[in-house]
């Protein structure tokens, strides 16, 4: 039985809800911060204290931070469309507000969830944490995630906050109600095409493996002030990733579209400019941001997490995806 009291921000999402479930099993007292109007039924069934609030509010609810010594900061504005400032307001200024709600002396750990997306939008072959992310990105989400990482580490260096930064790749798992459902919808309508090479690696991580890494970071004093890349630890091609979903859900398998990457980038740039000009609220079908998912080799090293945290992914890609697809089948 743990004597820690955890605050999980973004607890209504895939990562946050999975952490809440694991924390309850581990005997932690849990406070789950979710936005007003969000469905908190899963969290309530777990028996956690559900607190409603928003990182964009002027002040966070007092009950969210009172008595808390451990924070899992999962909340973020996600997507590939919108102004940089709209993302900064949540992902950077929201983080600042959250950090300022605590005295660093009261904190055991503050685990900040970043993203492998902060690295440069290029092909990656075992890129590790010694490669610094660029200061400028072409989409608001990635730009704000890079800035929030820097802010978290600044609070560690200058104010002594016990920060750990985790950089997960593409997260999949049960209770994902956004990314995989959209991908499945596109598979149904045969909108998914491979760009570049279908053999390019994904940077995927099963949510259970990410939760495992988060708890390893929580209990390791050597993790403080560090950044960790996190994936499933095996090379999974985009073809294998998408085909596994298609076959598992009895959906059409996409075909290879031999379009050079430079042409797709040109089309994406053109579509974005037109969408911005007409003030579109929704992203065009192809954006520069989602080219990373479709057209780049995303292979990152997790040797640092293995060495310092003792991270050894508990589930393989096949096991994690089978669990994920079973959840979708039982839900529908």
Regions inferred by a protein language model and the residue ranges of each:
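A conserved pocket-lining segment of Rossmann-fold NAD(P)-dependent short-chain dehydrogenase/reductase
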Residues: 132-135, 165, 185-205, 209, ...
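Conserved Rossmann-fold NAD(P)-dependent oxidoreductase catalytic core, especially the SDR/UDP-sugar
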Residues: 97-140
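Mid/C-terminal beta-alpha module of Rossmann-like enzyme folds, strongest
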Residues: 220-284, 322-325
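N-terminal Rossmann NAD(P)H-binding glycine-rich loop of SDR-like oxidoreductase domains
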Residues: 6-26
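Amphipathic terminal alpha-helices
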Residues: 5, 300-308, 312-332
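NAD(P)H-binding glycine-rich loop region in Rossmannoid oxidoreductase-like domains
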Residues: 37-44, 48-93, 101, 116
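Catalytic helix-loop patch of NAD(P)-dependent Rossmann-fold dehydrogenases
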Residues: 123-171, 192-195
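Glycine/proline-rich active-site loop of Rossmann-fold NAD(P)-dependent oxidoreductases
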Residues: 146, 159-161, 172-182, 208, ...
């Amino acid at each position: 039985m743990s004597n820690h009291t955890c605050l999980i921000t973004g607890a209504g999402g895939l990562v946050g809800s999975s952490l809440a479930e694991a924390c309850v099993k581990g005997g932690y007292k849990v406070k789950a911060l979710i936005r007003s109007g969000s469905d908190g039924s899963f969290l309530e069934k777990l028996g956690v204290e559900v607190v409603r609030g928003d990182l964009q509010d002027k002040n966070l609810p007092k009950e969210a931070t009172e008595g808390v010594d451990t924070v899992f900061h999962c909340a973020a504005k996600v997507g590939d469309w919108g102004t940089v400032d709209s993302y900064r307001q949540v992902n950077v200024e929201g983080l600042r507000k959250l950090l300022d709600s605590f005295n660093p002396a009261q904190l055991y750990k503050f685990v900040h969830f970043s993203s492998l997306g902060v690295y440069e939008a290029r092909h990656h072959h075992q890129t590790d944490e010694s490669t610094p992310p660029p200061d400028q990105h072409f989409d608001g989400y990635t730009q704000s995630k890079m800035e929030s990482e820097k802010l978290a580490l600044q609070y560690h260096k200058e104010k002594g906050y016990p920060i750990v930064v985790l950089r997960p790749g593409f997260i999949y798992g049960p209770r994902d109600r956004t990314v995989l459902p959209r991908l499945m919808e596109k598979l149904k309508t045969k909108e998914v095409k491979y760009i570049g090479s279908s053999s390019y690696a994904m940077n995927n991580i099963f949510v259970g493996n990410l939760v495992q890494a988060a708890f390893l970071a929580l209990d390791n004093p050597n993790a403080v002030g560090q950044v960790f890349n996190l994936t499933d630890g095996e090379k999974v091609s985009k073809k294998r990733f998408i085909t596994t979903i298609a076959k598992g859900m009895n959906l059409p398998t996409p075909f290879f579209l031999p379009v050079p990457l430079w042409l797709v980038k040109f089309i994406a740039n053109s579509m974005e400019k037109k969408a911005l000009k007409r003030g579109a609220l929704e992203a065009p079908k192809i954006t520069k941001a989602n080219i990373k998912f479709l057209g780049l080799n995303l292979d990152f090293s997790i040797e640092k997490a293995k060495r310092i945290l003792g991270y050894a992914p508990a589930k393989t890609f096949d096991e994690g995806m089978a669990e994920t697809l079973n959840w979708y089948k039982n839900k529908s």
